[in-house]
Amino acid sequence: MLAADTNVVVRIVTRDDERQALVADAFVQKGAWVSQLVLAETAWVLRDLYGLEHEEIASIIEMLLQHESLTLQDADVIAMALEHYRQRPRIGFSDCLVLEIARKAGHLPLGTFDRDLSKLDGAQRLL
């Protein structure tokens, strides 16, 4: 299976460069793997560079989870992170993802200085 980089995923969802979007579609057509890091970068790019709102990003992540040609690394972890992200708009998707990665690995609590993140089950505020 091939693997897709962040810019490939961004082109698939934004379609802001139709030529690149078509090439990205063709690249993933037979199946492509998307790492957790690529997904976290995609959420950041969509928020900071494209100015998308929280729920728009959540909907895109949901769409990627259901995309017929994409296999997301640890989709169960991503789904749980997405659930936290939807419930707590002040917490970034990458923070939610870090917590769920730690949970799956059996390494809780997740120590953090982030007030909002520490409100989630499994996270512990250090100060």
Predicted regions and their residues:
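Acidic, PIN/NYN-like endoribonuclease modules and their adjacent C-terminal/linker elements
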Residues: 1, 99-127
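Amphipathic alpha-helical segments within well-ordered protein domains
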Residues: 43-47, 62-65, 82, 99
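Short, well-structured N-terminal submotif of metal-dependent ribonuclease cores
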Residues: 1-34, 50-56, 127
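Alpha-helix N-cap and coil->helix boundary residues
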Residues: 4, 19, 34-37, 52-59, ...
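Short amphipathic alpha-helical interaction patches enriched in hydrophobic/aromatic residues
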Residues: 10-12, 46-50, 68, 85
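Active-site neighborhoods of divalent-metal-dependent phosphate/nucleic-acid chemistry enzymes
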Residues: 69-111
